[in-house]
């Protein structure tokens, strides 16, 4: 593939903003007033820039000048003093782009039939505070008779802080949700964020390559149902679908891969944060569970999760393979599964030979060396190339990441497979016996006349399509595969159950004397597995760096107050963020929304699992400590960051092999607070990027959804090939395991077709 030097990715326009009429103008103004409390304008009492002093947090001239001086002094090579002053005085809630992002966030809340608690409580609060000036409702929820819109910003901030510590779960969640909304909008659209933080949507030395010419099937306009016939229809173009397509096409079978998402070539990647969240992920960037306790990110474009994942290649560990085999699934300790993993490993070019560590990953490696913990460098699916790219979360312009859209699907296409983007499958079709799958049915939506996908669907060609096939493979991932099966009439009560999420909590280290620029370089090229077996049964945590794209990490920082939130943006180039990734023992479920037919998720991290997560946070804090962090910030409410009181003297004197919990009494006292901290959902902040097990493989129909060949129990010619068939959580990033299972399942399907 030849490089194309055009300077920056081709912009991908967003659709028009949705209508805002689900809230009144008065309610929107009250919302903006609350967001003022999250990210306020900060100025001096004598400032001539801010004329309405009620709209800012006011400091004395001395305090304000000192805040600016301290910020500049603490950030070597940071923004100029005049820019810091301008940024502090800026009021984000009045910016139109900031408001638009808040609108988009609220408009795509998944549970629109029963709005999540944020919007419910806002409606309750806003009705009381806007219809009854000086009423009991305002007093009850805010502690003030005067409505929020009439309060100075300092009071708005105080209200949010009181909600964050309220005994009422709903108010604590409201505070958390408002903070996340404001921080996300600020990181995506602030006119100052990039200049203050150093972040750029365009990677250094960006040079895209030519993408594969997919030649997607186009359906003519018409009123009737359009029919297509093939040997195998594969629903989903992600890690499972891509592997399956290659194997079956190379075996000589007619294959059609369909996906509800669209393909974006390297010339459009990485996208901006706003466009990437909208086009490359499901649900506008994040699903929320029914309790809003955990945010779930999963790929939603052509290539699925493989388009946006972070290149990490872990083989499934032996103790997990043995656990799965003990469930009556001997495949997992067989040489056949070894062969499948080896084929995947070789094809994706999993290697660590050319990795160049960025400062954030190096901090992990330095930390485990100083602490004497197990861990190391993790292979990448980059074919032995350096791939110093920290923005694959928003798509990879270099074409070096050998995921489905770059490697597997092109190989399938070269072997004769066909492809169809923009096709949302509603259900599997069955023969008259109700058992034998004979195809799928759904709705196809074209691109617009200019080849874009931002125009309203009603302005594009839409048509019902039936695809008739001898075999149907569902590879929609753990969110969509069970939903498609359920909507197809599969009655097995296990469909959608046994969902594992690898729930994570975060720790950020501020390395004030170092330019981390953590959005540059490999996202996860290091790991710690010292704590992966905390219960003696294979449940624990893996510690890893995480993506430092601002909307993904700045928005999930713990909100303490308005000044701290603004200063965080200035510290961003010095921040490295890490995750405690939990191999969850306990599970949830996925089910179709009764109105929209989209996935709904019922999951709460259990007390058993979250205790392991806390142990991971403690370990991450120790890594940050010994790696020289000047501030350690677990993303937990009510916990103050650790800032060395001695200027880092004890950190500098730390001896390798020593546990700093026993050498620094201040740090030990803070760790006790961390160990006692509340990370209980729904008010604690949890995220998931790995979904597994919702169509799990089992030895009998009573305990799972598919048999050891991937065939759906009680059905014929219907298979599932993706991470949803995992018998439990993998405990490692699941890409390689999902691909290996798809390799096994699709080769079995090919053998059946060959007779």
Predicted regions and their residues:
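Acidic/polar surface patches and capping/hinge elements
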Residues: 8-185
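FAD cofactor-binding and catalytic pocket of flavoenzymes
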Residues: 492-624, 631, 641-645, 688-693, ...
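Glycine-rich loop(s) and the adjacent beta-strand/alpha-helix scaffold that form part
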Residues: 247-274, 295, 301, 414, ...
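N-terminal Rossmann-like FAD-binding beta1-loop-alpha1 element of flavoenzymes
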Residues: 223-257
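Short FAD-binding loop at a beta-strand-to-alpha-helix junction that anchors the flavin cofactor
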Residues: 709-729
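Rossmann-like flavin
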Residues: 140-144, 148-176, 186, 302, ...
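Conserved redox-cofactor binding core of oxidoreductases
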Residues: 177-221, 331-432, 437, 441, ...
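N-terminal FAD cofactor-binding segment of flavoenzymes
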Residues: 253, 260-319, 360-369
